[in-house]
Design a protein with these regions (language model features):
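Short amphipathic, positively biased membrane-proximal segments
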Residues: 1-291
């Protein structure tokens, strides 16, 4: 909830930005085109994140630093605003803040799809997963997860440079996000109960066709909840990927971006309520025992 109220610190002082700079230096010093070198990189980054959480000690502060739901919504709505004005060039210019695909040549529908998919995936990465790991492991869990996810975004690509070096970071992120992605699908179904059956069908039958074991779950859940059809052809660094269709609805359009942001916020609120109830439940017996 602190993230919703205050947002993230400026990039110049944000600890995650500093972590990214440190890992860039580590890559320059230790890069080899091998999985072993990449595993060392991943282990170093994870250790830094966990260590930072242990030093910080405050789970609340660590969770606020690891969460980026407000900035996600702001970036997504910014694209929607320029799309509504018919400014395709402006929308393409804003897109790299949300997705890694090539924006050149994308039409309005493809830009809208990219943003909705990003909101779905980042609801896991930037909202649910940090809170989940904070609940499980405290401050080390929150910042350790954020470190893992940041490394995946930096080196977990299928490009020639990172196919081997980024393998360990990508797999570590897959493991760390596995449960949070499925929790996100459950919360999405709870937030849109009239679409619950369609959401679980999409997660069960369509998500396995996505190359990511976690992003596919979130995107399938959001597609079904919003009555959209996501997936299709994407281009990354000039390399085309054709992804399985997710959802059985219509193509996305600009007006669906605010709907996706509202859904992400509803998921966040449900998660906050769930965690508050769990905390109250665990505190209750202990308080009774003291009496």
């Amino acid at each position: 909830m602190l993230d919703r109220a205050l947002g993230e610190p400026p990039a110049q002082i944000h600890p995650v930005a500093w972590f990214g700079r440190i890992m860039t230096l580590a890559e320059r010093a230790g890069y080899r085109d091998t999985r072993t070198a990449g595993a060392i990189h991943a282990a170093l980054g994870a250790a830094l994140g966990v260590g930072a959480g242990a030093a910080l000690r405050s789970t609340t502060a660590a969770t606020a630093l690891a969460t980026a739901g407000r900035s996600l919504g702001t970036a997504a709505l910014g694209v929607a605003e320029v799309l509504d004005r018919g400014d395709l060039a402006g929308a393409r210019a804003r897109l790299p803040a949300l997705v890694g695909r090539d924006p050149a040549g994308l039409g309005a529908a493809e830009i809208a799809r990219a943003v909705v998919e990003s909101v779905a995936e980042n609801t896991v990465d930037a909202v649910v997963a940090p809170a989940f790991w904070a609940a499980c492991c405290g401050a080390p869990g929150a910042l350790g997860y954020r470190a893992v996810n940041t490394m995946d975004s930096m080196v977990g690509h299928r490009s020639a440079r990172y196919r081997r070096y980024g393998w360990a970071s990508a797999r570590l992120d897959d493991v760390a996000g596995y449960v949070p992605a499925r929790l996100t699908a459950a919360l999405t179904a709870a937030a849109r109960p009239s679409r619950g059956g369609a959401i679980w069908r999409a997660v069960r039958t369509q998500a396995p066709g996505h190359p990511s074991p976690n992003a596919g779950v979130a995107e399938a859940a959001f597609a079904a909840a919003l009555g959209l059809r996501l997936g299709g052809r994407n281009s990354y660094d000039g390399r085309a990927e054709v992804r399985a269709a997710l959802g059985d609805g219509r193509p996305a359009r600009a007006a669906d971006i605010p709907r996706a942001v509202r859904l992400s916020r509803d998921v966040s609120l449900l998660l906050a309520g769930l965690l508050a109830a769990a905390a109250a439940g665990s505190a209750g017996p202990a308080a009774g025992a003291r009496r």
